[in-house]
């Protein structure tokens, strides 16, 4: 599939004055000189009769070979009746509405979706001190955030369960016409004694049992409701040092586990290169993951020390980053806070 534009139908000031249809057709004709094997589309943010339920299809919806809508997956059922011969695609899906925007689609008629933006990026900040978009499920170093496992639970048949602690619920912010929540998640089990926590367990299994230092805190079923499916919420979970374990079961059998553990203080740094096959030829680029660990080699998520980085030999530091959009260190420097 080739996409030939984004929201072209919003641009009435084009010279053809037809909301992007002629431009799309010209681009498709040019594309077919090089590749006529793939279908073409344009990502649209459709007009509507009712913003929540019913679109008012733009001319581009008729012209394109695949109907691609940004965010408005709730329009698919009505437009499938209008255009029974069409294939649909959710070209931008919000990372703040994950779950419904996947489970509520008719996957026999919808190709799938692309999350915007699934990976954090510089630009489009929601306000200082953020330097860019931080609502992805992967940070800029490509480290998965807890809700990346929620996405995996939708697309993978591999049984899984993953604990995500809600650090900050916050309030919704309007951005580009959609609600963007300020909820922040973590896997940190170094906390204050007696603290009451809310958390999610992401799973594609039938049920999850939560255990704190071996004591069961209860069993909760996975909900079939698309707004709740694969995301089980727990409230008033008491903190105490030790281990918090989520056990997922399917048809009564244990199929997956995830454990959070209280760690000791950070005493060392662990370096892991992405590959050992690289050459000092001025062309190779290597990413090295630096992790703060305790005496048992466990990652210490509560460590926020300032790290100074030095390279010896035939290599130079190109950039450093900790994945935190609010961090004030420059990516072109040689120091960075652990995050």
Model feature map: region roles:
Residues 2, 10-15, 20-47, 58-65, ...:
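Substrate-binding clefts and catalytic carboxylate motifs of secreted carbohydrate-active enzymes
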Residues 30, 39, 46, 321-337:
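Acidic/polar low-complexity surface segments
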Residues 224-233, 327-339:
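Aromatic sugar-binding surface patches on proteins
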Residues 282-288:
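Short, solvent-exposed loop/turn segments enriched in Ser/Thr/Gly
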Residues 288-292, 297:
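Short, well-ordered beta-strand segments enriched in hydrophobic/aromatic residues
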Residues 220-222, 267-271, 309-328:
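Short aromatic-acidic-glycine turn motif
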Residues 205-209, 242-244, 288, 303-307, ...:
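Short beta-strand/loop motifs in extracellular/secreted proteins, especially
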Residues 1-4, 331:
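Aromatic- and acidic-residue-enriched carbohydrate-binding clefts of CAZyme catalytic domains
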């Amino acid at each position: 599939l080739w996409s030939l534009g984004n929201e072209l139908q919003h641009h009435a000031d084009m010279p053809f004055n037809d909301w992007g249809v002629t431009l799309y057709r010209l681009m498709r004709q040019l594309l077919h000189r090089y590749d006529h094997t793939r279908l073409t589309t344009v990502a649209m943010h459709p007009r509507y009769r009712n913003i929540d339920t019913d679109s008012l299809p733009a001319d581009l919806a008729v012209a394109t070979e695949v109907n691609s809508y940004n965010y408005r997956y709730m329009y698919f059922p009505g437009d499938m009746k209008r255009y029974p011969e069409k294939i649909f695609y959710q070209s931008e899906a919000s990372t703040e509405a994950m779950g419904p925007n996947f489970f509520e689609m008719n996957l026999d008629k919808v190709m799938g979706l692309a999350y915007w933006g699934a990976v954090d990026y510089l630009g489009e900040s929601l306000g200082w001190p953020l330097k860019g978009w931080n609502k992805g499920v992967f940070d800029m170093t490509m480290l998965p955030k807890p809700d990346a496992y929620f996405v995996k639970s939708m697309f993978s048949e591999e049984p899984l369960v993953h604990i995500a602690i809600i650090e900050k619920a916050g309030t919704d912010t309007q951005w580009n016409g959609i609600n963007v929540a300020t909820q922040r998640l973590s896997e940190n089990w170094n906390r204050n004694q007696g603290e009451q926590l809310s958390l999610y367990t992401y799973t594609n299994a039938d049920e999850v049992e939560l255990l704190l230092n071996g004591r069961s805190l209860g069993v909760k079923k996975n909900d079939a409701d698309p707004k709740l499916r694969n995301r089980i919420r727990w409230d008033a979970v008491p903190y105490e040092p030790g281990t918090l374990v989520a056990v997922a079961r399917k048809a009564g059998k244990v199929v997956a586990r995830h454990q959070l553990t209280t760690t000791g203080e950070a005493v060392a740094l662990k370096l892991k290169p992405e590959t050992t096959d690289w050459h000092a030829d001025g062309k190779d680029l290597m990413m090295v993951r630096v992790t703060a660990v305790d005496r048992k080699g466990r990652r210490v998520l509560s460590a926020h020390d300032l790290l100074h980085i030095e390279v010896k030999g035939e290599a130079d530091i190109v950039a450093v980053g900790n994945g935190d959009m609010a961090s004030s260190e420059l990516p072109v420097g040689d120091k960075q806070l652990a995050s």
